Every structure is written in structure tokens, then in C-alpha cells.
Curated annotation (Swiss-Prot):
GO biological process, one term: alkane catabolic process
Disulfide bonds: none
Gene3D superfamilies according to UniProt: 2.20.28.10
Family matches, as PANTHER family: RUBREDOXIN, RUBREDOXIN-1-RELATED
GO CC aspect terms: cytoplasm
Source organism phylogeny: Bacteria, Pseudomonadati, Thermodesulfobacteriota, Desulfovibrionia, Desulfovibrionales
Chain residues that bind Fe cation: C6, C9, C39, C42
Compartments where found: Cytoplasm
General function of this protein: Rubredoxin is a small nonheme, iron protein lacking acid-labile sulfide. Its single Fe, chelated to 4 Cys, functions as an electron acceptor and may also stabilize the conformation of the molecule. Electron acceptor for cytoplasmic lactate dehydrogenase.
UniProt keyword list: Cytoplasm, Electron transport, Iron, Metal-binding, Transport
Gene name per UniProt: rub
Protein name in the entry: Rubredoxin
Cofactors (names): Fe(3+)
Domain Rubredoxin-like, chain residue ranges per copy: 1-52
Domain of life of the native organism: Bacteria
Length: 52
């Protein structure tokens, strides 16, 4: 699975790790993240992420 990077702050979403602090289990692909998921660092929406 591809990693995605926030173009605002540089946070990298790694599907292998997920975002457990925000209820996203490891193994969750970027495309499967909830529509209202935001960058856990800066709050940017999914639309501000690009493939790493």
C-alpha cells in the first residue's frame, strides 16, 4: 500500500501503521480512510495529501 504525505505539514500517512490515535487501524489504505479524516498534525483534509 502506498504512503501519502500531507502537502501542508509533511506528515506521512503509512497504511501499515494506520492512525490508531484517531481510530484508524493498521492496514487501512488511504482510500479507505473516512471522508472526514484529517491530518492528525495540522488538520488538513484528505485532499491536501499526495502519494509519496
Amino acid at each position: 500500500m502506498k504512503k501519502y504525505v500531507c502537502t501542508v505539514c509533511g506528515y506521512e500517512y503509512d497504511p501499515a501503521e494506520g492512525d490508531p490515535d484517531n481510530g484508524v487501524k493498521p492496514g487501512t489504505s488511504f482510500d479507505d480512510l473516512p471522508a472526514d479524516w484529517v491530518c492528525p498534525v495540522c488538520g488538513a483534509p484528505k485532499s491536501e495529501f499526495e502519494a509519496a
